[in-house]
Amino acid sequence: MAPRAAAIRQTCCCFNVRIATTALAIYHVIMSVLLFIEHSVEVAHGKASCKFSKTGYLRIAELVSSFLLITMLFIISLSLLVGVVKNREKYLLPFLSLQIMDFLLCLLTLMGSYIELPAYLKFASRSSRRVSPSKVPLMTLQLLDFCLSILTLCSSYMEVPTYLNFKSMNHMNYLPSQDGMTHNQFIKIMIIFSIAFITVLILKVYMFKCVWRCYRLMKCTNSAEERSGSKMLQKVVLPSYEEAVSLPYKVPEGGPAPPPYSEV
C-alpha cells in the first residue's frame, strides 16, 4: 500500500490535492445555490430571458430546462464533495467530465472570438466614426464589465443560465467593445483580455489536475485496502477448557465410535 500510494503525489503546486478538491467542491456547491437563487429572483421579477418567448410552452420549457440544468450542476458539485469526504473515487467522475466540457467550451469561445475579430473590427470602425470621443465614466463601465466577464469565466460553469439562450452564444460578447476607444487602446485591451482569458484556461487545467490526482490517489488507496483486507486470515477465538470439555464428541460417519478413555 505504501509504495503505490507514494508513487502518486499528494500535492499539486504546493497544495494538498484533498484540501484543494474539497475547497473546490464547497465553492461550486455555493455557486450552484447562488445561481439557483439568482435565477429564481429573475424569473419572479420577469427579468429572465424567457420573457421574450411569446409562446407559452416555449416559456415553460426554457424555465424548466434552466432550473433542471442548475439542479444537475448542484448534484454534480455535491457528488464531488461527498466523494472527497467519504473517499469514494467514483463520485468524482461527473465533475471531471464537467471540467473537460467546460475547458473545451472556453477554448472554442476564445478561438471563435479571434476568428470573428476581423469582421468585428471592420464593423466597429465604421460605427465609431459617428460616435464622439469617450469620457471617463464610459471607460469605467467598460472596465467593470470586463472584470465581471473575467470573474464569470473563473467559475467552472461560465454563465450557467445562458447555455440555453441562443442569443448569448455570440462569441463577440466576450470581447471588450470598441465604442469610444482609439485603435491603440482597443489593441491594448485585447492584449489584456487575451492574457486574462489564457490565465483562466490555465486555472481550469490546474483545477482538473487537482481533481484528477485526488481521484487517482483515492482509487489507489481503496484498491490497496481491498487487497490487504482479502489477504488477512480470519481469526477464530479458541474455546476455554470448560467449553471444550462440554462440547459433544464428534463421531465419524460410517465408522465405529472411539473407545472410552480409561486410566491405566
UniProtKB/Swiss-Prot annotation:
Protein name: Lysosomal-associated transmembrane protein 5
Modified residues (Phosphotyrosine): 261
Keywords: Lysosome, Membrane, Phosphoprotein, Transmembrane, Transmembrane helix, Transport
Location in the cell: Lysosome membrane
Subunit structure: Binds to ubiquitin.
Family: Belongs to the LAPTM4/LAPTM5 transporter family.
TM spans (from-to): 19-39, 64-84, 92-112, 136-156, 186-206
UniProt key word Transmembrane: yes
Signal sequence range: none
Membrane topology: Multi-pass membrane protein
Main location: membrane
UniProt keyword annotation of Transport present: yes
Record GO cellular component, one term: lysosomal membrane
Pfam families documented for this protein: Mtp
Function recorded in the entry: May have a special functional role during embryogenesis and in adult hematopoietic cells.
